[in-house]
Amino acid sequence: MSNKIINLGSIEIANDKPFVLFGGMNVLESRDLAMSIAETYAEVTQKLGIPYVFKASFDKANRSSVNSYRGPGMEEGLKIFEEIKKTFNLPLITDVHETYQCAPVAEVVDIIQLPAFLARQTDLVVAMAKTGAIINVKKPQFLAPHEMRHIITKFNEAGNDEIILCERGSCFGYNNLVVDMLGMDEMKQSGYPVIFDATHALQRPGGRADSAGGRRAQATELARSGMALGLAGLFIEAHPDPDNAKCDGPCALPLHQLENYLKQMKAIDDLVKSFDPIDTSK
């Protein structure tokens, strides 16, 4: 098995390369907050020497409640993304939910994300593939790790091989997610880069009746475990005031803790990737 390398400008995304941080905020709440969070991430990652991609959503189309905040929408969201890219010289990742969004989004962002709940929607997969953009596939909570090969095949047959696989937890009974560490290793056997969404893996879906709950206090433990696998990247959302965030605050890392948090993750990644592989199958 060879590790596929995805090139994003000067950034190399691969399971055997230094990890890439995919981070930012869950949903665009305002232009000013997005700029502030992007600036913090940019400064911290530059200081620590961590390759970085800014993440935010312009529309959270799968909220638990019809009354929940969804975001500014595509048109306004893309304007904010353009300003962030220009101001901080950052690559961008965001998610799409409809086929018509793919082409205009791909003109602005570098990586398009396929949401976990939509990962089997063939029309959306094909539309995303045809943009030629790098694709981040969130593993659905209801699929086994080995079933990701079917989604990979759809993208390949639609002409796109620039694929990242993202673990974000699996359903474990009602209102709970667990992370299968061996499942992430199984996805790595595909050769495609695997990243770990340690933020959303902390969710308790529907845990607050009309919104998702979370276990923010365990954000460090879960991410440390994932980084010990030797992954291509880590996906982390942060917020300056998680308790008042408009989406997934219970899972968000407090922004002021970002630097110390990433220092630990980088130390683990550096250590694990300094080891020679051991083939215990023989």
From Swiss-Prot:
One of its GO terms (cellular component) is cytoplasm. SUPFAM superfamilies: Aldolase (SSF51569). Its EC number is 2.5.1.55. It is an enzyme of class 2 (transferase). InterPro entries: Aldolase_TIM (IPR013785), DAHP1/KDSA (IPR006218), KDO8P_synthase (IPR006269). Transmembrane segments: none annotated. Gene3D superfamilies: Aldolase class I (3.20.20.70). Keywords: Cytoplasm, Lipopolysaccharide biosynthesis, Transferase. One of its GO terms (molecular function) is 3-deoxy-8-phosphooctulonate synthase activity. Coiled coil: none annotated. Pfam families: DAHP_synth_1. GO terms for biological process: keto-3-deoxy-D-manno-octulosonic acid biosynthetic process. Pathway: Carbohydrate biosynthesis; 3-deoxy-D-manno-octulosonate biosynthesis; 3-deoxy-D-manno-octulosonate from D-ribulose 5-phosphate: step 2/3; Bacterial outer membrane biogenesis; lipopolysaccharide biosynthesis. It comes from the Bacteria. It is found in: Cytoplasm. It catalyses: D-arabinose 5-phosphate + phosphoenolpyruvate + H2O = 3-deoxy-alpha-D-manno-2-octulosonate-8-phosphate + phosphate. Belongs to the KdsA family. NCBIfam families: KDO8P_synth, PRK05198.1, PRK12457.1. This is 2-dehydro-3-deoxyphosphooctonate aldolase.
